[in-house]
């Protein structure tokens, strides 16, 4: 039986995009610290790398605000907007998502989202609303709001709570990363489906690659893939 399908966000619901993280922080530094751009950008990049290393190695979360604070950068909404505008190309929802989620919901399956992210919920919800899919989720967890990141079992438990499901054996997780998503979900007791299109840098690999229960090339395949498990 499948009560819920929970999705990763970046590289799963949004197609993978490769971008230069150094440029990401230069954009913010130019907006918020024009008198010390190079210094601020380097400090932001170092703080972000520390946050992601903590996520990979200790499965503890961080936030965009903490990155800015560690870099001694004061950024307001206008500065945030410049940063977000730079990254907008990587936030667009795959066109398969809306019909696929609708099919799952019509079958009585609850739909959730669990994203390892430094960014606040409001940013993610703005992007999902822009693409007309925000209201299709029964619950969403962004690790910027909880202590843990994938692959920690508590992150998956939080996602189950968000969609109102108690038994991990009745949940399926869909993601693009073999460590965070596939290993993590299976370690938490879920089935896991892999979307194998992301060019995840080797520096972001974890200690274990999960063996997915299924692999799909397109999100539109998800309803058919989980049908035998129902």
Residue ranges and their predicted role:
Residues 2-107, 120-122:
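N-terminal helical cap/lid subdomain that shapes the substrate entry/recognition surface
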Residues 1-7, 16, 38-39, 98, ...:
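Asp-based, Mg2+/Mn2+-dependent phosphohydrolase catalytic module
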